[in-house]
Amino acid sequence: PVVSAPNATKKPLRVLLLEDNQADAALISHELQRSGMRILLAQVDSAEGFTAALKSFTPDVVLSDHSLAQFDSRAALEVLREVRPTAPFIIVTGNLIPAQAGTAIRAGAEDVVLKSNMRGLEASIANALSARRRLHGLTDRQIQVLKLVAAGHRTREIARRLGLSIKTIESHRSEIMKRLRIHDVVTLVRYAVRVGLIPAAL
């Protein structure tokens, strides 16, 4: 089902919800509408429905329960990275131990929000979209360099691969970090995984 939230001032945010509990789905939908965001919400409850919706609904953000009857958030994230690699993925779950949450974040999930305290959901979505806007502010060449830096290639190797000077690569790298507001390579790698530019190395 697709649900829209009333608000005529902005283009609606397309939210794909992977959830097999209808009561929980209603609570999440209510929280999104309560926040004042204008949304177009589509709900699916299976791997097949999720894959189809990624192609037909083309979501701006994905919200996923951690564990469904025959599907889970890790499998869903893998499918998402194949079909819409840069779309934000936020886990909204009833219960997740810290170790599982950490694994999900390292795998590329944007955040983990507990159903018992969904007041942070709006901020999680806003932060995810802000991260993507900064990515879209980079040039195609800068994204090439970002991928290679995040994948662990040294400056000299990147220059050789792209047919550019070392000085040019250093300039690109400096500008990338400035635009993304990132100050070290470790954080840059995490960002690249988070926005789907490189696969997670678990």
What are the roles of these predicted feature ranges?
Residues 74-75, 82, 95-112:
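Alpha4 helix (beta4-alpha4-beta5 surface) of REC/receiver domains from two-component response regulators
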Residues 10-23, 28-32, 43, 62, ...:
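Conserved acidic segment of CheY-like receiver
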Residues 154-187:
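Recognition helix of helix-turn-helix DNA-binding domains
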Residues 33, 52, 67, 72-86:
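Short amphipathic alpha-helix used as the core "switch/output" element in two-component signaling
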Residues 29, 43-61, 71:
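Acidic, metal-coordinating helix/loop segments flanking the phosphotransfer/catalytic sites
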Residues 97-103, 113-126, 161:
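C-terminal output helix
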Residues 126-137, 199:
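The C-terminal output helix
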